[in-house]
């Protein structure tokens, strides 16, 4: 199948119908159906990627896997790194908000930027085992080691995508405080600062990598999140059978995709 003409929304519809393995399945294959589909899509884009396998204690019978893609690495400018976790908690759910919509945004960005002249290095990481909620043994922790080892050169900030399928309002969160290097990007996004549950940006921050998390909310959920009235309804879909494709907005995803591309320049 040729995926070149598909948007993030189109790819999300494909993933929503794909049965795969939970991140907690100790006997899952290295290349789960979800990860194999990502690999297939990247192949369709004719994009080179690096595979990083790693072991999680307690899950020694399987490998977990990060995928890395980089563009314009010859530039001396500080780069941006976008990431999203591809693993899932509930294999019976369509997992559209958590977190396949974000993976599909990453894939569309890769498709769009691969042949563009870029002003700075742009990197992508599609990471594993976020659902384990472990600051010291997950895909983003492995990513932090690779960042410190120079895999991606100098980075201005890492932008973690979560819950990006519905809403016109952009939110951002960070662990304890936003790194100074995030401020320019936050201003360009006109984003609302909120508090969120555990995510990969928190892991990166704990390991001394400048990072923030970004997503979108509708009017009602934005008010809840900004004013700390409770838990936004959209976030409550995570891990549930209600996290379905019919709750996703094609228009909102398209708008958010353009916003993501705008901060790459």
Residue ranges and their predicted role:
Residues 223-265:
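His/Asp/Glu-rich mid-to-C-terminal helical/loop segments that flank catalytic regions of hydrolases
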Residues 68, 81-83, 123-126, 156-161, ...:
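Structural recognition of the beta-strand scaffold that forms the well-ordered cores
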Residues 63, 89-202:
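Acidic/histidine-rich catalytic neighborhood of metal-dependent amide-processing enzymes
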Residues 1-32, 39, 87, 161-163, ...:
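N-terminal capping segment at the start of a domain
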Residues 73-79:
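Proline/glycine-enriched tight loop/beta-turn segments at coil->beta junctions
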Residues 10-72:
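A non-catalytic alpha/beta surface segment that caps or lines the substrate-entry region
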Residues 5, 9, 25-36, 96-104, ...:
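Soluble non-cytosolic domains of exported or imported proteins
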Residues 211-229:
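Short, solvent-exposed beta-strand-terminating loops
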